């Protein structure tokens, strides 16, 4: 099985990301309108690090976008990495790509020097709550449009070792 995961670095790779996102925007738990999708693509290109996953035929089968730092701190809190979203083609969701992707994501985040990883998930999804609860703790909850989101946090070292005992630690420390 010839999976390959890259970090986007040029226009061709960014175009593949944008095309994949647009074609699969309805696969999110709360589907994106075209207008919202274009906004998230633009924001990802401007602020994010974009990983693309390819199958053995060179077709894009997944993407993950993360930022170094948080928007609340103008991305100056570089000890934090925020995973903005993960999108995997439905045919690959229960494959070994998840494990391969997890390792590659951990490697990419490790290269940033991050100490903490944060991400959000829909509070109503019992599946996501159980999955993410295995390696991260809920540190807050917020209303996002018409649904509630849990905000998760995990130490990078626990993320790499997939599930150490740390649960929480909502550090909202912005460098001055």
Tell where the protein language model's regions lie, with residue ranges.
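Conserved acetyl-CoA-binding loop of GNAT-fold acetyltransferases
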Residues: 131-143
């Amino acid at each position: 099985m010839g999976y390959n995961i890259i970090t986007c670095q040029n226009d061709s790779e960014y175009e593949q990301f944008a095309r994949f996102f647009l074609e699969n925007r309805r696969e999110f738990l709360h589907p994106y309108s075209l207008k919202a999708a274009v906004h998230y693509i633009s924001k990802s290109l401007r602020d994010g690090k974009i990983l693309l996953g390819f199958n053995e035929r060179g077709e894009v089968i997944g993407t993950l976008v993360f930022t170094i730092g948080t928007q609340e701190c103008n991305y100056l809190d570089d000890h934090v990495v925020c995973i903005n979203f993960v999108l995997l083609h439905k045919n690959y969701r229960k494959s070994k790509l998840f494990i391969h992707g997890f390792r590659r994501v951990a490697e990419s985040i490790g290269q940033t020097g991050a100490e903490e990883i944060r991400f959000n998930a829909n509070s109503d999804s019992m599946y996501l709550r159980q999955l993410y609860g295995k390696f991260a703790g809920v540190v807050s909850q917020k209303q996002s449009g018409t649904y509630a989101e849990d905000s998760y946090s995990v130490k990078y070292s626990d993320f790499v070792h997939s599930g150490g005992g740390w649960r929480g630690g909502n550090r909202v420390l912005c460098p001055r």
